[in-house]
C-alpha cells in the first residue's frame, strides 16, 4: 500500500517539475541501522525503560489519544488499552532543553514558535512511548534489545532528519 503511494508521489513531483537531492524511505537500511544504533545508545544510557501504559486508543489511527482528543475528535472506534511498551525518559532532558533554547535564541525560528516550545516545556513533560508490541503492529523497525517490539513510527521517523544526511557514518 505504501509502495503505491510512494510511486504516485514521485510521478506527481515529476509532473510538477519538483526535484529533490535525495529520496529516503524509513524502510531503507541506511535509516533502520541508524535507528537501531540510537535505540541501543539510549538504552545503554538508561534512557529507555519498559513500563505498562493504559489509555484511550484509536483503532483507526493506531495511536493512543488524550481524553480531550477523544471528546473533540471524530474517532470511529476508541477503546481502553493496557499494554507494556518502551518509553524514552524525555522528562530527564526537560531542564536541559529549556536552558539550551534560552541560551541559543536563534535555535528555534520564528520566535513565536520558540515561545510556544518553551511554554510547552515549562509544563510537566511526560516520558515518550517509543514502541509497539509486534502482536499488535507487525511492521516497523524491530527493537535491537527486544524482538517482540517495533519502534513506534513517530520516534523512528523523526530520526530520518539526521539519518538522511548520513549521521554517524563515514560519509559525513
Regions inferred by a protein language model and the residue ranges of each:
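N-terminal glycine-rich dinucleotide-binding loop that anchors FAD/FMN and/or NAD(P) in oxidoreductases
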Residues: 1-2
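A glycine-rich helix N-cap at a beta->alpha junction
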Residues: 9-19
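Short polybasic/polar patches that bind polyanions
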Residues: 14, 43-44
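Structured secondary-structure scaffolds
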Residues: 22-26, 30-41, 53, 57-61, ...
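A short, conserved structural fragment
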Residues: 47-49
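Metal-ion-coordinating, acidic/His-rich active-site neighborhoods
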Residues: 67-69
Amino acid at each position: 500500500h505504501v509502495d503505491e503511494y510512494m510511486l504516485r508521489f514521485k510521478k506527481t513531483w515529476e509532473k510538477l517539475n519538483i526535484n529533490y537531492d535525495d529520496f529516503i524511505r524509513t524502510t531503507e537500511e541506511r535509516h533502520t541501522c541508524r535507528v537501531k544504533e540510537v535505540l541501543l545508545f539510549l538504552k545503554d544510557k538508561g534512557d529507555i525503560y519498559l513500563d505498562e501504559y493504559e489509555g484511550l486508543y484509536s483503532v483507526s489511527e493506531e495511536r493512543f489519544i488524550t481524553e480531550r482528543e477523544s471528546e473533540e475528535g471524530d474517532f470511529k472506534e476508541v477503546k481502553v488499552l493496557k499494554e507494556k511498551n518502551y518509553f524514552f525518559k524525555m522528562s530527564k532532558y526537560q531542564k536541559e532543553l529549556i536552558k539550551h533554547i534560552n541560551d541559543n535564541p536563534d535555535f528555534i525560528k520564528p520566535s513565536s514558535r520558540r515561545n510556544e516550545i518553551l511554554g510547552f516545556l515549562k509544563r510537566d513533560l511526560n516520558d515518550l512511548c517509543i514502541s509497539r508490541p509486534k502482536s499488535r503492529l507487525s511492521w516497523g523497525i524491530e527493537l535491537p534489545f527486544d524482538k517482540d517490539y517495533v519502534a513506534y513510527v513517530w520516534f523512528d521517523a523523526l530520526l530520518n532528519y539526521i539519518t538522511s544526511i548520513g549521521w554517524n557514518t563515514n560519509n559525513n
